[in-house]
């Protein structure tokens, strides 16, 4: 491709409204342009990268035995009503009526459509197991689209759905998809981690997320220093206490704490050990008999809202009780709450159950109890794992301790079981002629999100540093003053032809531009290999080669360059 015939829309300045580096660089490199909030057009450079990601995803899905189909982006509301998600999904589901006043949605996902399709097309066990996938545009009406392609409203996704009559084949397909996703990200040259995950609104049992590691990642990953165990912080299991609860050594005493509204203030003012304090959070309960529930974690720990949401006594989705409701029920506000004398269900974290001589709010404004002990000052409360793990704690497999990393979720695989097939009556006849509800798996990859995540992991102060497999072009040719030198023009043109004939994707910068602009553009858009051609190089019989990732420069003889680049691109 010649730049003179190409739409290379680079920008020097960083757009003011671009918060993360991938958004900034995708705009500056001329990959995307904003049409409206969360809606973008792909320019040629961006589309080339997107198509390469898509091709790798498609190849690995086909290799894993999945079959490609295509379903409509517009979906009839009746299917969503059938599964109950018409009411559950919320405002992210964009709903509209056609001219006949029928309800439709723009699909954020396709479980309903694929289940409807399969219940009409598959009737016998002989047609199973079956794994179907598509690469299709999705739409989620995010309340606050941000971060460019990381959290846009419209995005490209690969979603696959498998159907089974038995758990064994469902497990086999799940493992095949796990391997396929690992292959996809490995082929793209990305550092990633598969992690155990919560199933979220889609539901189901087994679930893994695939995260591209990046400092800017929204998700916190807890992984083992001694094994392959890794989990999203929402799912990571806290270790059970190994030491018994210590004996009481302090008397219970009521202390005035007028300036201690937070654990940090309490610890600082009274020189307390933070591990000897607890914080009490009041959430809405699941029943009329218990409209409020107290959740208690150690002062240095954080409540895990996903774990708390799954407690039977807690209303789902989890909702913190407003201060007015708390004051009406307890007589004190946040900052002065604790378990002693609290007239509501109390659920404590396992780590709190072994605490002794600890401090907590006294349920009177500006007062705390010090020296609290279970089974002396109050009954031992129900205990559960309701906190986030912390670095250095032992992992559940016993093979290491927790370490933390940030990641960007780009893939998610689920075992759905019968969540959708049962509500939609998707059944087939088994080998005994009996009707059986289908088991399902669901496997998603954010194709457009991978592009942004790859940039978040691969950039420097000059621009994008693409991994070889998804770079828009492999080689950039930079002829110096080619419009003034016939020698430079002739050699640049010949090299362009030779590399193209060798199957290498080349971008020849044939513009009448200053060398500084040409170099800056090549580095900004992240082409892995550049070749500089000038009169001095020609006199010396060499090309100047530069590797974008390492910055390494070397002179390559004319007759060796094509083979050198073929090897460089392959590696």
Swiss-Prot record:
Main location: cytoplasm
Enzyme class: ligase
GO process annotations (BP): prolyl-tRNA aminoacylation
InterPro entries: aa-tRNA-synt_IIb (IPR002314), aa-tRNA-synth_II (IPR006195), aa-tRNA-synth_II/BPL/LPL (IPR045864), Anticodon-bd (IPR004154), Anticodon-bd_dom_sf (IPR036621), Pro-tRNA-ligase_IIa (IPR002316), Pro-tRNA-synth_IIa_bac-type (IPR004500), Pro-tRNA-Synthase_IIa_type1 (IPR023717)
Record-level Gene Ontology MF annotations: aminoacyl-tRNA deacylase activity; ATP binding; proline-tRNA ligase activity
GO cellular component: cytosol
One Pfam family per UniProt: HGTP_anticodon
Keyword terms of this UniProt record: Aminoacyl-tRNA synthetase, ATP-binding, Cytoplasm, Ligase, Nucleotide-binding, Protein biosynthesis
Keyword DNA-binding recorded: no
CDD domains, per database record: ProRS-INS (cd04334), ProRS_anticodon_short (cd00861), ProRS_core_prok (cd00779)
Enzyme Commission no: 6.1.1.15
Cellular compartment(s): Cytoplasm
Family matches, as PROSITE patterns: AA_TRNA_LIGASE_II
Chemical reaction(s) catalysed: tRNA(Pro) + L-proline + ATP = L-prolyl-tRNA(Pro) + AMP + diphosphate
Record's comment describing the protein's domains: Consists of three domains: the N-terminal catalytic domain, the editing domain and the C-terminal anticodon-binding domain.
Record text on subunit structure and interactions: Homodimer.
PANTHER family cross-referenced by the UniProt entry: MITOCHONDRIAL RIBOSOME PROTEIN L39/PROLYL-TRNA LIGASE FAMILY MEMBER, PROLINE--TRNA LIGASE
Function, in words: Catalyzes the attachment of proline to tRNA(Pro) in a two-step reaction: proline is first activated by ATP to form Pro-AMP and then transferred to the acceptor end of tRNA(Pro). As ProRS can inadvertently accommodate and process non-cognate amino acids such as alanine and cysteine, to avoid such errors it has two additional distinct editing activities against alanine. One activity is designated as 'pretransfer' editing and involves the tRNA(Pro)-independent hydrolysis of activated Ala-AMP.
Family per similarity comment: Belongs to the class-II aminoacyl-tRNA synthetase family. ProS type 1 subfamily.
Name of the molecule in the record: Proline--tRNA ligase
Species assigned in the record: Shewanella sp. (strain W3-18-1)
Lineage start: Bacteria, Pseudomonadati, Pseudomonadota, Gammaproteobacteria, Alteromonadales
């Amino acid at each position: 491709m010649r730049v003179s015939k190409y739409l290379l829309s680079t920008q020097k300045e960083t757009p003011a409204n671009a918060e993360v580096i991938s958004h900034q660089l995708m705009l500056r490199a001329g990959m995307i342009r904003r049409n409206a909030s969360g809606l973008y057009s792909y320019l040629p450079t961006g589309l080339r990268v997107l198509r390469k990601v898509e091709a790798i995803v498609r190849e690995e899905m086909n290799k894993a035995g999945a079959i490609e189909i295509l379903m409509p982006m517009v979906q009839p509301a009746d299917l969503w009503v059938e599964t109950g998600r018409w009411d559950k999904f919320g405002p992210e589901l964009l709903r509209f009526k056609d001219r006949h006043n029928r309800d439709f949605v723009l699909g954020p996902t396709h479980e309903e459509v694929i289940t409807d399709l399969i219940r009409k097309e598959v009737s016998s066990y002989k047609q199973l197991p079956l794994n179907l996938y598509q690469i299709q545009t999705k739409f989620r009406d995010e309340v606050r689209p941000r971060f460019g392609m990381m959290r846009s409203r419209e995005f490209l996704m690969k979603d696959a759905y498998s159907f089974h009559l038995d758990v064994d084949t469902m497990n086999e397909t799940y493992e095949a998809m796990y391997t396929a996703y690992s292959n996809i990200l490995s082929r793209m040259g990305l550092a990633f981690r598969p992690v155990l995950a919560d199933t979220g609104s889609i539901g189901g049992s087994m679930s893994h997320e695939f995260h591209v590691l990046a400092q800017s990642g929204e998700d916190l990953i807890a992984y083992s220093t001694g094994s392959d165990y890794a989990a999203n912080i929402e799912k990571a299991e806290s270790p059970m206490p190994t030491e018994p609860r210590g004996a009481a050594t302090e008397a219970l005493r009521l202390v005035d704490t007028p300036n201690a509204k937070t654990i940090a203030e309490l610890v600082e003012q009274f020189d307390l050990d933070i591990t000897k304090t607890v914080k009490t959070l009041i959430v809405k309960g699941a029943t009329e008999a218990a409209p409020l529930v107290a959740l208690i974690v150690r002062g240095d720990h954080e409540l895990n809202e996903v774990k708390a949401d799954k407690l039977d006594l807690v209303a789902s989705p989890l909702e913190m009780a407003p201060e007015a409701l708390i004051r009406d029920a307890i007589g004190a506000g946040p900052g002065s709450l604790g378990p002693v004398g609290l007239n509501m269900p109390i659920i404590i974290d396992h780590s709190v159950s072994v605490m002794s001589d600890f401090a907590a709010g006294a349920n009177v404004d500006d007062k705390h109890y010090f020296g609290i002990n279970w089974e002396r000052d109050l009954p031992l409360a129900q205990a559960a794992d309701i906190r986030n793990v912390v670095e250095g704690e032992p992992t559940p497999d016993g093979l290491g301790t927790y370490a933390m990393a940030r990641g960007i979720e780009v893939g998610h695989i689920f075992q759905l079981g019968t969540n959708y097939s049962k509500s939609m009556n998707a059944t087939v006849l088994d080998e005994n002629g009996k009707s059986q509800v289908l088991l399902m798996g669901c496997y998603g990859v954010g194709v457009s999100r991978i592009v942004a995540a790859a940039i978040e992991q691969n950039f420097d102060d000059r621009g994008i540093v693409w991994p070889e497999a998804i770079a828009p072009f492999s080689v950039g040719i930079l002829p110096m003053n080619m419009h003034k030198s016939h020698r430079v023009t002739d050699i640049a043109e010949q090299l362009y032809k030779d590399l193209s004939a060798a199957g290498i994707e080349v971008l020849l910068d044939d513009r009448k531009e200053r060398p500084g602009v040409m170099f800056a553009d090549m580095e900004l858009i992240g082409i892995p290999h550049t070749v500089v051609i000038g009169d001095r190089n020609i006199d010396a019989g060499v090309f100047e080669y530069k590797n974008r990732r390492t910055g390494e420069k070397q002179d390559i003889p004319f007759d060796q360059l094509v083979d050198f680049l073929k090897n460089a691109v392959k590696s």
